[in-house]
Design a protein with these regions (language model features):
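Conserved blade-ending motifs and adjacent loop-strand segments that build the rim/top face
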Residues: 228-242, 301-325
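Short coil/turn segments at the loop-to-beta-strand junctions that recur within blades
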Residues: 56, 97-105, 144-150, 186-191, ...
Length: 377
């Protein structure tokens, strides 16, 4: 009887421990005031400077969007309406340049997505998708149902397509049979756009809410709560959001040219704002605005430790990078300007690779420079 009691107590303890672990995974608690001195190399396994092959057949004007899948880079150049595919060592693979008015030609590409197998999906803002194989050969044109005001972002996983609209609506579309569901995400609130808030992790398409730090998984049944950031006293309250709504309504009626940072920080409606939330094999990451500055939050899933910092020891920020496939991707963005220091690349970060980086950016005949920050696994 004594041994049975011990077994029961042990089982109950294990069940409670498992439940606590599940709760901890559902809510990541972070003290934004507790800063950690962090080096890029505390987070990254390695850094790659990619010298994109430059020839008459593959010259890029500007990089509008870039994605990485395994050892392949996918780049859309809006100025040329062309799509380029490279190996991560810089070798050119192929180019898609099918702008026109024919049945297999696109007029304007708003966004693109690449499947797990390397198939390419180019999205027009009025609801057409141009589907290409992993060799750049055209497969089909897909006409989406007319249920969104605009079609602004596309994300593909397995046989499912998710489309985000500037209006705050979502279309979930099945590739095999064309069935679909549409859902309302949240209202666009002036300068707080419901775009660039979606990321892909493994087989899941995830979205971060505008103000309450919730991370949702997008599926055929709509939004399912997955987990949340908890910034304790720095969480935005309902009162904060109400104040934000009132100020935006007041200023919009006065032709006020406001920017996001007018509403975030000390003495302003919002205590913090997540620009991007993404997840890698090892980290859960939030790139934020807090206390009138950029802020990084890296939660290490392997040891449950948090790193909170404004800049790395090497004076780097990742807010101007794109996240894709366990990698932060930096590329020259001449149109990105601001009153803050947006430095990402320094000598301390690149070390002996800095000369290669400088040679690329100083060569006016070469393609834009791309740098890959490979996160630890």
């Amino acid at each position: 009887m004594k041994y049975i009691s011990i077994i029961i107590v042990t089982l109950l303890f294990l069940q409670c421990s498992e439940k606590n672990n599940q709760l901890n995974e559902k809510r990541i608690t972070v003290d934004l005031e507790e800063r950690t001195e962090t080096s890029v190399f505390d987070l990254m396994d390695s850094i790659t400077v990619v010298p994109l092959e430059s020839s008459d057949s593959c010259l890029i004007s500007t990089i509008h969007q870039i994605e990485k899948k395994n050892d392949t880079l996918y780049i859309y150049d809006m100025q040329q309406s062309s799509f380029f595919c490279y190996k991560t060592n810089g070798d050119f693979l192929f180019k898609i340049s099918d702008k026109g008015s024919g049945p297999e030609e696109y007029q304007y590409i708003e966004h693109f997505s690449v499947s797990e197998t390397g198939e390419i999906f180019l999205l027009e803002p009025w609801g057409n998708i141009y589907h290409y194989g992993n060799n750049g050969i055209f497969i089909q044109k897909i006409k989406l149902p007319n249920v969104l005001k605009s079609y602004n972002e596309i994300y593909v996983r397995r046989n499912s397509i998710v489309i985000n609209s500037l209006s705050g609506d979502i279309l979930y579309f099945s590739l095999p049979d064309g069935t679909y569901q549409s859902f309302h995400l949240y209202e666009r609130m002036n300068i707080f756009f419901p775009l660039k808030r979606t990321s892909v992790y493994n087989d899941s398409i995830m979205n971060v809410s505008l103000f309450d730090n919730q991370i949702y998984k997008i599926g055929q049944d709509g939004l399912a709560s997955s987990w949340a950031w908890d910034f304790k006293e720095n969480n935005n309250s309902e009162k904060d959001i109400k104040r934000l709504t009132n100020e935006i309504e007041y200023k919009s009626g006065d032709n006020h040219n406001s920017v996001m940072t007018d509403y975030i920080g000390k003495g302003k409606p919002l205590r913090q704002f997540i620009y991007t939330s993404c997840e890698s094999n090892r980290f859960k990451i939030a790139l934020m605005e807090h206390d009138n500055n950029f802020l990084h939050v890296f939660h290490d899933k392997s040891n449950k430790m948090n790193r909170v910092f404004t800049r790395t020891k090497e004076n780097t920020i990742f807010h101007t990078c794109t996240y894709s496939d366990n990698t932060f991707i930096y590329f020259n963005q001449p149109f990105v300007k601001g009153w803050r220091d947006l430095t990402c690349i320094t000598k301390e970060v690149l070390g002996e690779k800095y000369n290669l980086y400088k040679n690329i950016i100083d060569d006016y005949d070469s393609n834009p420079v791309v740098i890959l920050f490979h996160l630890k696994k």
